[in-house]
Amino acid sequence: MKKNMTFHKRKIWVVLLCCILMMTGLIGRLVYLMCFRSDYYYKKAKELHEREREIKAARGEILDARGKVLASNRTVCTISVIHSQIKEPEKVIALLSEKLKIDEAEVRKRVEKISSIEIVKTNVEKSTGDEIRECSLAGVKVDEDYKRYYPCGSLASKVIGFTGGDNQGIIGLEVKYEEILRGQPGKILTTTDARGVEIDKLGETREKPIEGKSLIISLDVNIQEFAQQSALKVMEEKQAERVSILLMNPQNGEIYACVNVPEFDLNDPFTLTDDLNMQLNESGITIPSEDHNEQSELAVQTTSGKTNTERKQELLNQMWRNPCLNDTYEPGSTFKIITMAAGLEAGVVSPGDRFYCPGYKVVEDRRIHCAKRTGHGSQNFVEGAQNSCNPVFIEVGLRLGIERYYKYFRQFGLLDKTGTDLPGEAGTIMHQKKNMGEVELATVSFGQSFQITPVQLAATVSSLINGGRRVTPHFGVAVLNPDRTEGEKLIFPVKEGIVSEETSKEVREILETVVSQGSGKNAKIEGYAIGGKTATSQTLPRSANRYISSFLGFAPAEDPQILGLCIIHDPKGIYYGGTVAAPVIRGIFENILPYLGIEKNDVSDFSAEGN
């Protein structure tokens, strides 16, 4: 009996000891968690019971050179519902259906869904949001947001660009200067129960967003509007495919206007222009049969094998392209300015040198024709430029030779991109030096068999007429802080010593005679010395008989303050650059030279040597 009692006592002590050890372990673990891991579990609890919603920051504005707003913000609302807080569901459903123009069944689905918060509609007009807020219905949230707004509609659409549904830039300056414009979002912190549903009575904590900075650009609305009207007019008159006009300051690279018609509506960027919509309709859409198992738009295919959605996206991408910098073309005779500058700089030609044009030039086994098949006869170099004579410039190219011509091509910056502050700039398409023969050299010398962008041509010619400084064509000028105080000035690279001052002066003088006495006479303006060069180039394939008519001009010729380039794609009827494109630049210059404060002067003494 005594043995049994002793045995039972031992068992009790063992159990008691185990319990003590377990309690000690539990208390120790509890002390450890409460004292040493409290921060971790506090954060975990907060994560479970707090919900964070973003408050979008107001995006910075884009302003033109004179302070006119080109891109701004409109206040819109996001309407949401919180299931647990709704007391009158039928009233909520009826109100939201009426005000938001949404089917009641769709609203009911969101109202009856058990979730922390359910968005009913975004981008609601502020007036509508205010009306819903005034009804003070429990469980209905009205949060203010921002939507990008473009006061000038389609003006400079391919330059300014637009934003997406998340208010982030997609194309143009909107995406290039995203970090400056976007601002810093704020937060709304709310407390939720175990199911993740917001607890209304506990309120919410807000962190205010920081507004984005604004961007001042060199583009001038008045100049852009006039240039855009001029482009539309000539496009309609000549039934052209498209027209591009670039106007920039050759001294500092600031771009005053960049026109690419047809433009598109920045406030409705996903709707095709009429001509592109016609292309979509003509692409041969095949409607699926009634028993087709694909009900989405993706099932609808065009005759090209692409879905309707894919084809539309292709056309949208085409509509958004900026041909002045996204597309390359054969510049034709405007490129003779580059050959002229290289020849003068290298000393292989001078203004008084004599040439003979029989209407063609034989290079190796090829006869390369002049635009004037009967020939220009005997002429000096200046007259060759006035006549836009191909054999003269072929001869200058051959005198330079492949090695030197390629050297100047590189020295002038033509093998590099300009570095302009718009995304998607295309590079030059040029023969490799090792693959160039004399025939290729001959065709390059008058602007054929290679391709560059319009902005590249404008930047290169600027460096040849401004004294030899390679400026970067750009739009960005300065940044404004949210409080409208001036922020940083935007600075772009400048490269010195492209050509000598003497060569630059000779180029200006020769090009002035092209307008005053030669093929560019349709750009002449009384009282102003205008320099320029015409071009008429045939697109590939040559057999299609499609042309690009262009004119590059600058003023005043003695000290250029503005350079203009007009390119007309596939004009109908008369297609010569001097006849079609030169008058466009003349009309623009007549209008904007006084606007820029450039006064008329005596131009009688401004002439080229040897002419």
Model-derived features with residue positions:
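Beta-lactam-recognizing serine transpeptidase/beta-lactamase-like catalytic domain environment
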Residues: A71, D193-E204, I245, P250-T334, ...
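Periplasmic/cell-envelope proteins involved in peptidoglycan metabolism and beta-lactam response
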Residues: M1-K306, M319, T328, E403-L415, ...
